[in-house]
Amino acid sequence: MKNVNSKQNNHSTIGEQDIHFFHEGKHIYAYEFMGAHKASEDGIDGIRFTTWAPNAKSICVIGDFNHWQVEDKNHMKRITDAGLWSVFIADVKDGDKYKFVVTNKDTNHYVYKSDPYAFFSELRPNTASVISTQTTYKWHDEKWLKKRATADYYNSPMNTYELHLASWKTKDDRFMTYEEIAEVLPKYVKDMGYTHVEFMPLHEHPLDASWGYQPTGFYSINSRHGDLVGLKHLVDKLHTHDIGVILDWVPGHFCKDQHGLINFDGSACYEYQEPTKAINKGWGTHNFDLGRNEVKCFLISNAMYWINEFHIDGLRVDAVSNILYLNYDREDGQWVPNIHGGHENLEGIAFLRELNGVLKHTCKGVITIAEESSSWPNISTPVEQGGLGFDFKWNMGWMNDTLRYISLDPVYRKYHHNLITFSMVYHYSEKFILSISHDEVVHGKKSLINKMWGDLWNKYAGLRLYMSFMIGHPGKKLIFMGSEFGQFIEWREYEQLQWQVVDEYHTHRETLNFFKKLNEFYKAETALWECDYDHKGFQWIDANNSEQSILSFVRSNKDGKEKLIFVCNFTPVTYYDYHIGVPDAGSYIEAFNSDDLEFGGSGQLIADEIFSTPESSHGFDQRITIKVPPMATLVLKLKK
């Protein structure tokens, strides 16, 4: 895909090069001339409107500036046979609302459409696009961007806090503005020790309950929280607090509300022509035609828009399986095989490889993450090596297995020991992120703490055990908001988190303190992130003690000089005189203990040094004897 930068001082005309590469599917900055842009003609200032509608008979721009009347002078002119339309309209100003009246050439039926490339939209339930050209912002994150360009994410700490802006916090029973969020979120995330935030989708969507995953305005930011400048300020503040920003992005499908992309020119335009490929029954949406050049430009330019205009550091691509498979969530007879007779969506595969190739070439240091739940191979393998080119993949298998395990009565865990160990069999096949996301704490699945077995004490202990086991397991980390203080109710997108419980109950304060200390421990210990994807970074001590439901393993840094010994006890029993092999001779000290009293634990700590003895154990020449606290993770390290 050619790196075409069409930025001009005057958008009165659209360059031939822009037109050519747009229709060829090779333009990655289409947002610079598509949509509504400042222009002037014959010394008169106004706005040039441009859209793509190949099967339109006519398109008229209506809005505040002409009292929403269809007028001849505001009809677009078709400027290419392939369906580009454009018109200059004078005396249009920022903040004016507008729509396109699109008449189909075959049926003469007309529809009122929002601008697919609009930078701003009305707040739901209204659906008009809004002229937004005054978006200049003075950034202060040069230091961050310079560091990002040369970052080695695979060998750096990455501990992400996922959040839904509308329900993280509210103010006076209303949505907080981006500016208001910028005053509290960066400091909170920084103080808690996270390295990144991941925002659930920030593009415009009509239904709050869709959480942003059924968008209508891909270039329109979520108007519930304010304007473009406000969002830029929020990202800027996060960067100046040394926090990376990842955005959930939905390139596979779109909302079928009539003002949006569906049948944009009266026929299938952005979606596939074939209903078997276009209609996504499971989500009630339509799938993008990822083989159509202009649609590829729309989507890849959209990725570039978020990265360039808002300094986004990474895109987590939603529902990748829906892009890869023709038979995703479809029964036999509801899908048509590809030209080779298979179920692979060849156009979707090519799109993902092209997307990742473009971003890797043009956006140094920006990462892409695949939310993908199948066993499709080489998702995080570079494009030039035959892979899809993502930097990371969510480990849905680890999440499902371990959450199932941790919900079991400890009496029965020994029969399901493989659930807690199996992930290491395939861990090195991809660059995995261990994710406990929003999907796991909603729709009857229970909150994270409520997934834990037992009474109240054991639930808190189980949460501490599980999260410290997760920190020790190879792979980068992600946790959803509310889990860090042990919210018991499921996430509700229509109200803020129950922050009041932190003030009201010591158990929630202790849990919040635990997460803070655990995150700080993670960042401070190179053994926990330098070799996440290198075999030398992890070694089992004992993966087979199913009878006592105890795991032990070693994490090592790049040069092997820093090692951490993890002992995870998934039962409420304290084990005394427990023997484990260790890789080095010397004295060991406690580095972290999830059973600490300050976290609400029972206080079964190891206060003294533990000296190894030259006895063979678990394949090592040295052995230590320890007390293993109940329902807890104990971490030891060699004393310097």
UniProtKB/Swiss-Prot annotation:
Q: Where is the active site?
A: 318, 371
* GO terms under cellular component: cytosol
Q: Which UniProt keywords apply?
A: Carbohydrate metabolism, Glycogen biosynthesis, Glycogen metabolism, Glycosyltransferase, Transferase
Question: Which InterPro entries does the entry link to?
Answer: A-amylase/branching_C, Branching_enzy, GlgB, GlgB_N_E_set_prok, Glyco_hydro_13_cat_dom, Glyco_hydro_13_N, Glyco_hydro_b, Glycoside_hydrolase_SF
Described by its record, this protein's role is as follows: Catalyzes the formation of the alpha-1,6-glucosidic linkages in glycogen by scission of a 1,4-alpha-linked oligosaccharide from growing alpha-1,4-glucan chains and the subsequent attachment of the oligosaccharide to the alpha-1,6 position.
Give the protein family.
Answer: Belongs to the glycosyl hydrolase 13 family. GlgB subfamily.
The entry's protein name is 1,4-alpha-glucan branching enzyme GlgB
Task: State the organism of origin.
Answer: Francisella philomiragia subsp. philomiragia (strain ATCC 25017 / CCUG 19701 / FSC 153 / O#319-036)
